[in-house]
From Swiss-Prot:
Keywords: Aminoacyl-tRNA synthetase, ATP-binding, Cytoplasm, Ligase, Magnesium, Metal-binding, Nucleotide-binding, Protein biosynthesis, RNA-binding, tRNA-binding. The keyword Hydrolase does not apply. GO terms for biological process: phenylalanyl-tRNA aminoacylation. This is Phenylalanine--tRNA ligase beta subunit. Its cofactor is Mg(2+). It comes from Prochlorococcus marinus (strain SARG / CCMP1375 / SS120). It is found in: Cytoplasm. Tetramer of two alpha and two beta subunits.
Length: 837
């Protein structure tokens, strides 16, 4: 929102300088993003008077002008404008002036042999809207002509300071000059000088709705139309109106349109004018109030807007119709088929209150955002809608000798005044004490806070006075009634959208009194912050994976639609088709990352990600937290001895790397046979389990999918339920650090090799060995696995190393042998194993 200081001065008394005002607005929540001094654009520009002109002796299209710019002697300027003549006042850029809009610094130069000591400017060369095709002639601009040699900044409306404010979504009243004036009045406790609004033909008639328009009335939307005659679309606005519109970033069109835009800037209510005669031509009949309607557009319909753009409409877009012909997109832009023009003499003036959500949807659908849609999206109070119409009618009647023929509204406005209870106790409890600074002139040597004058500052704490509370709320326009507990507060129309609860009123009180005036209290006692157990485990997982060589990646959660997936979650308003749905897995993007890295001739790519996936199940959207990753190649730096060796990992190496990373969590993850999975290699994959629950999978990517990636080495991927890891790792018995004494006696190791069916897992065998050999067997683990030549089909050779140890005594051979024989026999029985050693 661009706020003009001179306009603001008309609406409220300002008793501080520009910088103080900017600071106070920023502290109150209206951040001043930029202070713009418009007069800076006219630095070096003066008013000149063309005394005489003569043709250029060496150029047919140039003239040599003698121009008085208020100096002792007139200067000579070579000019090529067709409308140059003697006896006119012009805008002269003197030597050294920099014209920003055309990136030109004026210097004394020779043009075709004639000296030129400046430049006679057009309005466009100064960054202003042009009024003709040539230079600016002040006599033709309907402004007071300044003295010769004086900068015409005041006459051009550029003697101005602009506050560029950032308006937050909860303060729609800040999108109007009146709203900002009220805020300045409340902050500085100064007098408001708002324009008086005369109610012209006060009563509105309620018109009949067609079927579709009734739906909009039921949404508490307001639609008002006023028929006004005896206007003139060929009239220009005053320079004051033009400059104020220009300073707000709005182009001047004609007096009718300009006054609707002027009202919008002043009051915050968008208005639109339809040419009544064009509507009659469009419909082929005399238009009455009952011809107007509001409905949803039909897919395939279109409207050429007043900006000349052809908008394709969908069934989500609300449109205004006349005899069912679309004449505007509700709350956004009017149609060219009914816009005000130079021939306009009669208009239908529209003032409406559209649903913020419907305007937002329509705006997104057509890809257009306007000053009107911005205001409707943030919300407008119904009282503002009607008062703004009256304000615009006042301006039109003052500018034209016009007649208000009809005034219509779609429903009776019933304004329910809601009183909010504001409790004194709640204010003091929420805001705390106010710090009162007092000066002690007779301070002794023992005073703790003594300034250079020898005076000391004494800080005292007190509750907020009732007077301060009442003054703050009254300055906002609230009406107060005393209550036993505090006050009953009636909120003004311009603040009804954001002051809805007691806490909202308390916030306003603290904002206006000043946040810095309240005592700040630290928590007592102070406790150091820290991580939750789950946060600690998550950090530990990251550290562990990084320590074994993984790199963390963060991939986009938005993906393209997968034609083979039926449980994807669609985004309601995607920006691109490539980001139209939420992801259902993490591994897909991980494979793409591996492919890109290997294409750049990296030795390997080990990555992981802790992220969320989304899917629809029985109509509900589920969110799952996963730990996923991929390994391809070998990340170790090759040496001269090993540089020529294959750097790919096998299944067991890759699984061991993941096992090493997760081993620090003190959780027992087991591998089991994985059912058929089209993503993974059928013989090199496993289902991972944690405490009997399915944790996820680990395995080599299926050869058919690997060939699509054009990578020479196998890729191993894993997907684990991260919530299950957190649940298991954060149990008290896992978090408590336990100490196991190092063994003080030697162990005895024996190897055992056996031939078993290839569907028997090594984990089952090692578990049986440990269980059978208790308490002497300390550990048993796989040291070799072979299937191929000299091994029967369907069989596999597995070799295990068994470690025996007693707690206190050294083991003897005669103690180990019976246990070892028992294990051998048990393996034969349980797995039909053929012992090889």
């Amino acid at each position: 929102m661009k706020v003009s200081l001179s306009w603001l001065n008309e609406l409220v008394d300002i008793h501080c300088d520009v910088e103080e005002l900017a600071d106070s607005l920023s502290m109150a929540g209206f951040e001043v993003e930029e202070l713009i001094d418009l007069s800076a654009s006219l630095e070096g520009i003066v008013t000149g008077y063309v005394i005489d002109i003569s043709p250029h002796p060496n150029a047919d299209k140039l003239s040599v002008c003698k121009v008085d710019i208020g100096k002792s002697e007139a200067i000579q300027i070579v000019c090529g404008a067709k409308n140059i003549r003697s006896g006119i006042h012009v805008l002269v850029a003197t030597e050294g002036t920099y014209l920003k809009d055309i990136d030109l610094t004026i210097k004394t130069s020779h043009l075709r042999g004639q000296i030129s000591q400046g430049m006679i400017c057009s309005l466009s060369e100064l960054g202003l809207p042009p009024n003709n095709d040539g230079i600016a002639i002040l006599e033709e601009m309907n402004i007071a002509i300044p003295k010769i040699g004086v900068c015409p900044k005041k006459q051009l409306g550029l003697d101005e300071i602009i506050f560029d404010l950032a308006i937050t979504a909860n303060r729609p009243d800040g999108l109007s000059m009146v709203g900002i004036a009220r805020e300045v009045s409340a902050i500085n406790n100064t007098k408001l000088k708002l324009p008086a609004i005369d109610l012209l033909h006060k009563d509105y008639k309620e018109f009949d709705h067609n079927v579709e328009s009734k739906k909009f009335a039921s949404r508490n939307e307001v639609y008002s139309l006023n028929l006004i005659d005896n206007l003139n679309g060929n009239n220009d606005s005053s320079e004051e109106v033009k400059s104020r519109l220009r300073n707000a970033g709005i182009n001047s069109i004609n007096a009718i349109v300009d006054l609707t835009n002027y009202t919008m800037l002043e009051q915050g209510q968008p208005l639109h004018a339809f040419d009544a005669d064009l509507l009659c031509e469009l419909t082929g009949k005399e238009v009455t109030i009952n011809d107007f309607g509001i409905r949803k557009a039909k897919t395939g319909e279109n409207l050429i807007g007043i900006d000349g753009i052809d908008y394709s409409l969908s069934s989500k877009v609300d449109v205004i119709t006349c005899s069912n012909i679309i004449i505007a997109i509700a709350g956004i832009i009017g149609g060219k088929n009914s816009c005000v023009n130079k021939e306009t003499r009669k208009i239908w003036l529209e003032a409406a209150l559209f649903s913020p959500s419907s305007v937002r949807i329509s705006s997104r659908e057509i890809g257009k955002r306007t000053e009107s849609s911005t205001r409707f999206e943030k919300g407008i109070s119904p009282e503002i809608t009607i008062s703004s119409v009256e304000r615009c009618l006042n301006l039109l009647t003052k500018t034209f000798d016009c007649q208000i023929l009809e005034k219509w509204i779609n429903r009776e406005l019933v304004i329910e005044e809601q009183l909010l209870l504001l409790r004194r106790e709640k204010i003091n409890k929420t805001l705390g004490k106010v710090v009162e600074h007092k000066t002690n002139i007779n301070a002794g040597d023992n005073s703790n806070n003594i300034d250079k004058s020898g005076e000391s500052q004494i800080n005292t704490l007190r509750n907020i006075d009732d007077h301060e509370i009442e003054q703050s709320l009254i300055s906002l326009g609230c009406k107060l009634q005393k209550d036993v507990k505090g006050w009953l507060v009636e909120v003004p129309a311009n603040r009804k959208l954001d002051l809805k609860r007691e806490i909202d009123l308390i916030e306003e009180i603290s904002r206006l009194i000043g946040y810095d005036r309240f005592d700040s209290n630290l928590p007592n006692p102070l406790r150091p912050g820290g991580l939750t157990p789950k946060q600690k485990i998550e950090r530990k997982v990251r550290e562990s994976l990084t320590s074994v060589g993984f790199q963390e990646v963060v991939t986009l959660s938005l993906v393209a639609k997968d034609q083979y997936s039926k449980n994807q979650v669609a985004i309601s308003n995607p920006l691109l088709s490539e980001t139209s749905h939420l992801r259902t897995n993490l591994w897909q993007e991980h494979l793409n990352i591996c492919q890109r890295n290997m294409a750049y001739e990296q030795k390997g790519c080990w990555i992981y990600e802790i992220g969320k996936i989304y899917n629809i199940d029985s109509g509900r959207i589920n969110e799952t937290s996963l730990l996923c990753g991929a390994l391809v190649g070998n990340k170790s730096i090759g040496q001269w001895q090993t540089e020529t060796k294959n750097s790919s990992l096998d299944y067991f190496q890759s699984r061991g790397i993941l096992h090493s990373a997760l081993n620090s969590l003190n959780i027992n993850i087991t591998d089991e046979k994985l059912d058929e999975n089209q993503l993974l290699h059928p013989g090199k994959s496993s289902m991972l389990k944690l405490e009997g629950k399915e944790l996820g999978f680990f395995g080599e990517l299926h050869p058919s999918k690997l060939s699509d990636l054009n990578i020479d080495y196998p890729i191993y991927i894993f997907e684990l339920n991260f919530n299950l890891i957190l649940q298991s790792s954060t149990r008290k018995n896992k978090l408590n650090i336990s100490f196991k004494q190092f063994p003080t006696v030697p162990s005895m190791e024996r190897d055992i090799a056996l031939l078993v069916d290839n569907n028997i897992q090594s984990l089952d065998i090692s578990n049986l060995i440990i269980k059978t050999g208790r308490p002497l067997v300390e550990d048993a683990y796989l040291i070799d696995r072979y299937e191929g030549d000299n091994i029967p089909k369907g069989k596999v050779s597995q070799a295990f190393r068994i470690r025996y140890r007693k707690n206190k005594d050294t083991l003897k051979e005669e103690e180990v042998s019976p246990i070892h024989d028992k294990i051998r026999e048990k393996l034969k029985v349980e797995f039909s194993a053929e012992l090889r050693s």
